Amino acid sequence: MGLPVLSVGIYQPRYGNFQHWALHLHTDFEDLIYEVDGEHPTFTKVTSHGKPTDTSSLIKSLFVGEIGIPDIATVKRVVEEAMVDNETLEWDCQDYVLEILEACEREAVLEENDPDYAEVKEILLHKRGPML
């Protein structure tokens, strides 16, 4: 039995020129994709079963890290508690994913000082925003 894995799927833009991001939780028992869909001010949370590679719009999947089996429930709770911000004009699916990752740091699911995670987070922060 392998450890659960978190990754971020980066997809072709759905709206405008912003790449779409979603969080992927892979376990031995299920694959869940957490994302927001829509545009300001009508974003909605969506959870689906499947892998990022199930769609042709996937550009790449960034490995965030392995997590402990007890952390599966914590990640699911963090996602459930994550808020959709339909008030802030600049908020989007990329912010949603970054906010969940930061909440996972606060819950000690992810370690901010882990060099691999820090590198992925830096890549995501660099990719944040419109495609140029």
Which residues does each PLM region occupy?
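N-terminal accessory segments that precede or flank the first globular/catalytic domain
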Residues: 1-40
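Compact, well-ordered interaction domains used in eukaryotic information-processing assemblies
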Residues: 27-56, 63-66
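Active-site nucleophile-His-acid catalytic modules used for acyl/amide transfer and hydrolysis
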Residues: 56-132
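Short secondary-structure capping micro-motifs at structural edges
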Residues: 9-11, 20-21, 45-50, 82-83
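Generic alpha-helical secondary structure signal
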Residues: 15, 38, 47, 97-100, ...
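Short low-complexity stretches enriched in small and charged residues
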Residues: 14-19, 51-56, 128
